[in-house]
Amino acid sequence: MLKNRVAVIYGAGGGIGSAVARAFALEGAKLFLTGRHRAPVEVVAKEIVSGGGSAEAAEVDALDEQAVDTHLQSVIDKAGRVDISFNAIGIPTPKIRVPLVELDVEQFSLPIATYTRSYFLTARLAARRMVANGSGVIITVTATLSRTGTPFVGGGGPAMAAVEALTRDLSAELAPHGIRVVGLRPQGMPETSRIKESFGAYAKASGVTWEQFQELLASRTHTRRLSTLAEMANVAVFMASDQASGMTGTVVNLSMGSLDD
């Protein structure tokens, strides 16, 4: 589905980014993997190459405009174009779980500023290259916090809602140039270390164990289970392919029914 497509993945060393990278590679994409720290990204790239795929690793801070721009230009120089931009960055989970009325403004603003800046920079700089080719796909990743009222998550909900709004606005501007912009909204996959850290802290603040909290989340889904990284990666492949050519300006609900559209 993605044979010879050139894909840039941000946060490729993390759970979501690495799963999507492997799925893209299986479908024939040429991968340029990035992360703030090179070592975990290099592990993923070597695994893909050893399996017969095409992948290069680079250390890129997705909050640094110059770093992102320089890397994208290097991709253009090597591959001639950028077909897919997939951003799966994460930020450390705040250790303090307090009500919004007690939350420090800097802690509240951190996820909002971080996620919106990264998604804006990576999308804008990729789009500038894609416009020249008249095609491309930009994929964002959010969470159900964008649509639910959830206590003790600080600026997480507003950050996710902002990224989804950015997804729609980018699509409105870029679709006439042949560029699709779509989002993926999982509820949270316990396979990832980031989710374990985030939900684990939330479980502790709620007075339950991590296992009990997972059971609670699963009980709220239609399937009575949480989604997996493989399921999300498969959807990412579809959304990045021409099979999803009719989809743009939308966010795919991967909440297993816990969030009704």
How should these model regions be labeled?
Residues A29-V43:
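Conserved glycine-rich Rossmann-like NAD(P)H-binding loop of the short-chain dehydrogenase/reductase
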Residues G13-G14, H37:
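Conserved glycine-rich cofactor-binding loop
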Residues A175, R180, M247-G249:
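Short, small/polar-rich loop/turn modules that mediate ligand/substrate recognition or access, typified
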Residues I91-P92, V105, P111, I139-V163, ...:
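Catalytic loop of short-chain dehydrogenase/reductase
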Residues R97, R225, V237, T248-D261:
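Short C-terminal tail/terminal secondary-structure segment
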Residues R128, A172-E173, S245:
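Alpha-helical segment proximal to the catalytic Tyr-Lys
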